[in-house]
Amino acid sequence: MANITLSTQHYRIHRSDVEPVKEKTTDKDVFAKSITAVRNSFISLSTSLSDRFSLHLQTDIPTTHFHRGSASEGRAVLTSKTVKDFMLQKLNSLDIKGNASKDPAYARQTCEAMLSAVYSNNKDHCCKLLISKGVSITPFLKEIGEAAQNAGLPGEIKNGVFTPGGAGANPFVVPLIAAASIKYPHMFINHNQQVSFKAYAEKIVMKEVTPLFNKGTMPTPQQFQLTIENIANKYLQNAS
């Protein structure tokens, strides 16, 4: 993986006769910069990735979606499949497997980001269920924190509870949704469509990233999610 020197190059302008930069920033470049930044600030990975990806999209994605004609004609050619194909194309352009095969650190950071997202999503869901049952969430948080620590996630312990440093939104799903919503904004007005596209993005990201876990010691996202669900079910059953 290339050394991260893009920021220095973009701002090092000392002469008035500097020619315009010809190199075009790609989705792969943006992703590589964001995932490498995890080494210094893993907790901000998903946010920074989404911001940079969206910034790139604003300057790179064509704003024209349909040729001029009747409104019904434009809508007829835009389907859910069109949006999903676009997200798949964006995911492929990131070349996650290719980058991971060249850089072990990149591969591990990718796995850490995925497991941290699984931790965050399932923690929030399970905590809501426990609270609705009148069950204290502190023992649950402590136990899933231990599970996250045993899985090899970096983080810190506060008040006896371990929390992964990168807990938050999935750093791979967010850019795909952002890209598609910018290119096809009208397809994201309906809530059911939003849910459908998010589920599809999660599905293709999971399929793309899961093979990376087979080469390491960390549990797969599916295994880690099952661990958290089993812990939650134990507390829910005790509350019944």
Swiss-Prot record:
Keyword Secreted attached: yes
Ranges that cross the membrane: none
Q: Which residue intervals make up region (GEF catalytic domain)?
A: 78-240
UniProt xrefs under InterPro entries: SopE, SopE-like_GEF_dom_sf, SopE_GEF_dom, SopE_N_dom
Q: Name one GO cellular component term.
A: extracellular region
UniProt superkingdom = Bacteria
> What does this chain do?
Activator for CDC42 by directly engaging this Rho GTPase and acting as potent guanine nucleotide exchange factor (GEF). This activation results in actin cytoskeleton rearrangements and stimulates membrane ruffling, promoting bacterial entry into non-phagocytic cells. Chaperone InvB is required for secretion, translocation and stabilization of intracellular levels of sopE2.
An example of a GO molecular function for this protein is: guanyl-nucleotide exchange factor activity
Keyword annotations for this protein?
GTPase activation, Guanine-nucleotide releasing factor, Secreted, Virulence
| Protein name, per record | Guanine nucleotide exchange factor sopE2
- UniProt cross-references to NCBIfam families, sorted A to Z: PRK15280.1
Per the UniProt entry, what are the Gene Ontology biological process annotations, in alphabetical order? actin cytoskeleton organization
What lineage is on file? Bacteria, Pseudomonadati, Pseudomonadota, Gammaproteobacteria, Enterobacterales
